[in-house]
Amino acid sequence: MKNISILGATGSIGSQTLDVIRKSNGELKLIGVTANTSVKKVIEIIEEFKPSYVGMMDAVSTHEIKKYCEEHNKKIKVLEGIEGLDKIASLDEIDMVVTSVVGMIGLEPTMKAIEAKKDIALANKETLVVAGEIVMKAAKENNVKIFPVDSEHSAIFQCLRGNDINTLRKIILTASGGPFRGRTLESLEDIKVEDALKHPKWNMGRKISIDSATLMNKGLEVIEAHWLFNCDYDNIQVVVHPQSIVHSMVEYNDGSIVAQLGAQDMRLPIQYALLYENREKRIADTIDFYEISQLTFEKPDIDTFKALNLAFKAGKAGRLMPTILNGANEAAVELFLDRKIKFLQIADIIERCMEVFKTQANKELTLENIIELDKEVKEYVIKNAVL
């Protein structure tokens, strides 16, 4: 049995992780969960999975969960805020942490988990985007395994199994193209929030859905792949694959290409990360190749979707430039979801921040500098946002 903590248990990835645990026939046990403020969902988790630890992000929801546990005689340790995240990520009782919180808040608990020598099922992109060098070094020093939960990185991870990574020539990251694939820049001027949230293939949270619409999600995945697989940016290629059946590919020095195919179901990469090397259980539908009419591949339109190109530039610049990229994107996406800026302004804001903060990008790469600059960039975006 493997004991698990989930950071962000009520979100899209967290909920699907719970389903993997539910269907694991006792191979996985939930020990700790954290959530933002979703009291009702956490109570449902408590009743079904009986975790020993629960963390909520604010005082009100923490009080409500404590009150519920007292009234129903639940012997659960209820924790609050970032301290609760850190504690639940590094419990003595657990073997692995699923980091499915969204945004920069995932960085600190991920580092705490690594320091406590807990393996990581990583669904929080921002951790590697802003601090990949620090995180991967710490993981190596603490003999911690990092299992990617993103479908693309899980695919690459699987394609590399049994092969010498030194013979890797190129990583080919596939992208669905998002809901606006094939659209012109002019046609995206007045995109509504509701339209941007309608991903054609995947069921995802709000922030990642907007990132997919701008192609920033793929840009963040490029930086993530660079750190996970120690691959130069010039050897990472993004290919638009609208059917989302080929989840990613790797090309070796001999010219052969290995691809991973599967259903559009995030439970597949989650299960692979949690039950590594155990492929006995089928949790998702299989592909019927007689039903697939075609698999197509296209070049991404980086003129219309410039966020992808900005991510490549930030990754190549290194140091703190990915922090600027990520912070500006997080703040801009939030403003768009709140209907305070237009869709195309997201990438414009990111580009402007990369220019405004470029001198600070060369500071030493430390967790303190990352957190400080992230805050500064977000404050700048909020202060200067104009619809």
Swiss-Prot record:
Residues binding 1-deoxy-D-xylulose 5-phosphate, per UniProt: 125, 151-152, 176, 199, 212, 217-218, 221
Keyword entries, A-Z: Isoprene biosynthesis, Manganese, Metal-binding, NADP, Oxidoreductase
Please list the GO biological process terms of this entry: isopentenyl diphosphate biosynthetic process, methylerythritol 4-phosphate pathway involved in terpenoid biosynthetic process
- Annotated residues for binding of NADPH: 10-13, 124, 126, 205
Stored SUPFAM superfamilies: 1-deoxy-D-xylulose-5-phosphate reductoisomerase, C-terminal domain (SSF69055), Glyceraldehyde-3-phosphate dehydrogenase-like, C-terminal domain (SSF55347), NAD(P)-binding Rossmann-fold domains (SSF51735)
Part of which pathway? Isoprenoid biosynthesis; isopentenyl diphosphate biosynthesis via DXP pathway; isopentenyl diphosphate from 1-deoxy-D-xylulose 5-phosphate: step 1/6
Could you tell me the EC number(s) of this protein?
1.1.1.267
Cite the binding residues for Mn(2+).
150, 152, 221
**Single GO term (MF):** manganese ion binding
Name the chemical reaction catalysed here. 2-C-methyl-D-erythritol 4-phosphate + NADP(+) = 1-deoxy-D-xylulose 5-phosphate + NADPH + H(+)
Record keyword Repressor present: no
* Top EC class for this record: oxidoreductase
Q: Does the keyword Oxidoreductase apply?
A: yes
What Gene3D superfamilies does this protein's entry cite?
1.10.1740.10, NAD(P)-binding Rossmann-like Domain
This protein's cofactor list reads:
Mg(2+); Mn(2+)
This chain's function reads:
Catalyzes the NADPH-dependent rearrangement and reduction of 1-deoxy-D-xylulose-5-phosphate (DXP) to 2-C-methyl-D-erythritol 4-phosphate (MEP).
Question: What family classification does the UniProt entry report for this protein?
Answer: Belongs to the DXR family.
Q: What is this protein called?
A: 1-deoxy-D-xylulose 5-phosphate reductoisomerase
**Which gene carries the instructions for this protein?**
dxr
